[in-house]
């Protein structure tokens, strides 16, 4: 049986109101989340009344797997008969919003999500129709398109009224775009628009609002620190401000990394001010790392000095100190996970090549070292190691050194949308269609592109 810390057990047992779980890195939050949901089912909470929002589809898959495991465990104990997930919703807030929107408002049943690439292709193909050539302030067409897409995202995330803008050309362009993607045969909604549309429908229709608020009893929100204002508005609507449904928010303000997408750490910092009867529980035990790694992480987020460097900390954060522990079966206690030599290196290099040599040396030193992986002792492999870089532009010296030593690697990451492989392939295809010379996409030479007007629209 799983052994829980005092705080983890408290998070599992609390039933007297809304819950804010501050979960430090490696603190077992997914285990606590899945166990709490399974326990609610065993207590008779209808599965169809439970929502679990995750930030990604991958996280949703992991949570589903964990909940199934916990439900199966409860069935073996004789506490439930059915170990299936049933109609528990586990997934992203965008997918949930589209699903619910189609269910409560038939006119949206033909709509589909428009992803970033298709949105960009539509805007490119309808550049003149949308009047984007009239917009000022950009140095090129591609820069105009980038700014227009970002403007659209901000409009929906921040719930802005387009008609209040001072730039009439921008107002016209936004309306032209909105009318185009929502008319047949397109019927598209962006990720941000989906939430905006659902929020609008619930707010404007009292009967639908009452129906939705009576339907759900428990709303779980993972990675709550990355929730933006529009998403928070929807969560409050679904839960009637935490009065008809219990909101269990799980996150860590120290791990907020999506502010560039509109997420605001303020939501997690002020959760207790917006919802009634909130209990805050902090899961501060890191089961993943040693003391040295946790110590440097604590120093980073609290603004302490590390060596000769000042590490930038958050000006406002929830008080917490992460600790490194593991459960010792022999003593039946949680004990500190002590640091080992080499857990943390703080190095300064005179050149990129010197840094690359150090990294390659460490990889070769670590290869084959005995490692306890989920109870199985094995040697470390290349697949157990990763190199984090500021951007793909900083990888060449490292990859050159890895190549020289025949160390296998895979580069993962994303380039800009208009420099992506997909866009290059589409561009090449259009060049073939129009018997035009293929030119590698260059943001500064966007005038040389030719696009087929119907390429991005639905068949």
Indicate where each model-derived feature is located.
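Helicase P-loop NTPase motor core
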Residues: 27-30, 277-279, 285-407, 434-437
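Short glycine-/polar-rich loops that comprise or flank the Walker A/P-loop
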Residues: 17, 45-49, 84-87, 243-245, ...
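Conserved helicase NTPase motor core
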Residues: 2-13, 17-22, 59, 89, ...
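ATP-hydrolysis module of ASCE/P-loop NTPase motor domains
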Residues: 14-15, 83-87, 105-192, 216, ...
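P-loop NTPase Walker
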Residues: 1-107, 210, 353
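ATPase/helicase motor core of nucleic-acid motors
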Residues: 245, 274-275, 339, 379-459
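Alpha-helical scaffold elements adjacent to nucleotide-binding pockets in ATP/GTP-utilizing enzyme cores
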Residues: 36, 62-70, 96-100, 122-126, ...
